[in-house]
Amino acid sequence: MFMPDSIQLHLLQPGQRATITRINGASALRRRFIEMGIVKGETILIERNAPLGDPVEYFIKGYHLALRKEEAAQIDVILHEGANG
């Protein structure tokens, strides 16, 4: 189910903060996300892009992680108000 204000994580820019609303994709990928702490309701901060734009570094639950844009496209989020860096 698509939430009206939700967007895919890979569309956000460094400095933006969002709340995870849905995890899509194959069950193996969803399981991997859960193991990394990427779950519905968590806040995630977009830290920075790699020099060529992929992967992107995120900050969640007190640690940094990098996801490829194709992986981040499977995560729906709601952008926080005033979340531009």
Task: Go through each PLM region and give its residues.
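Short, surface-exposed secondary-structure edge patches
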Residues: 9, 33-37
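A structural micro-motif recognizing beta-strand termini
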Residues: 22-26
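Short alpha-helix capping/helix-loop boundary micro-motifs
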Residues: 5, 28-32
